[in-house]
């Protein structure tokens, strides 16, 4: 009987925590790792092409800290076809992956929506509190030697109506964290949650317009898709309360940047907390200089727990696909075992 070929996986990046799982899977599959160049996308492309020229691969995955080498397109991944039938991204968002190209070629794209949940939701909570309490302004005042000079009274979360746009895993986790703080939680989502889950989260479903017009705090927790690009722009800001607070840990392009900056300058938005920006890793200087905005360098997932869980999710998706032909959490397909 002819012995079957050992299935091969190309890994872009290095695993830090899931070493035991990798050791177990390495008994069934062959893993080849390449280290991406964090400063030069073209060099990473060269490494992938070189690996593809020497061997065939059945699946490919990449991990965190990939902003410098994205997007993941035909230019980068094309040589892995036609044998490679799965790309797994170690993130919940997949807007930097050319899913349409992959779909045309019968290649699954899978994300890891549960891996980043806690880290991102905790970042959301941190920015929520910092924004309400004006932490950036207070810290800057102290660092300049101006002890409490010109500081205004800030807000507590109790009694605030918090509107969550996007009630997926991250939105739900954030809702659970703020419910004990005495917040009134409303949400808008593509699909309404079941009544029991709404009760568990203490969240009420409202229309998009009602969320905009009635919320004291608006939290962006939806994925970036063609439908959510510039979801919040001039007319949406006009519907909001004066002095609203904005939190965004999803993607920068969900909020139109020009309209956002105008809303902050005018006072329509009192303060904001941002972990994501339109242009990464070089955001608009306004965000770096404005005392009314608490900022982070898209690092919500940069915790030991989150990275470890995401690595396990990536490997679980790889194993499921190589064993069954269908990955965990595909965002396209379905395809047959051999693609289209």
From Swiss-Prot:
* Family to which this protein belongs: Belongs to the D-isomer specific 2-hydroxyacid dehydrogenase family.
Name of the molecule in the record: Putative 2-hydroxyacid dehydrogenase C1773.17c
Keyword check for Nucleotide-binding, yes or no: no
Keywords on this record?
NAD, Oxidoreductase
**EC nos:** 1.-.-.-
| GO molecular-function terms, A-Z | glyoxylate reductase (NADPH) activity; hydroxypyruvate reductase [NAD(P)H] activity; NAD binding
Q: Which residues are NAD(+)-binding?
A: 169-170, 249-251, 275, 298-301
GO cellular component term, pick one: cytosol
EC main group: oxidoreductase
The protein's matches in CDD domains, at most eight in alphabetical order, are given as: Mand_dh_like
Q: Which residues form the active site?
A: 251, 280, 298 (proton donor)
Top-level taxon:
Eukaryota
Where does this protein come from, organism-wise? Schizosaccharomyces pombe (strain 972 / ATCC 24843)
Q: One GO biological process from the UniProt record?
A: generation of precursor metabolites and energy
User: Is Oxidoreductase one of the keywords UniProt gives this record?
Assistant: yes
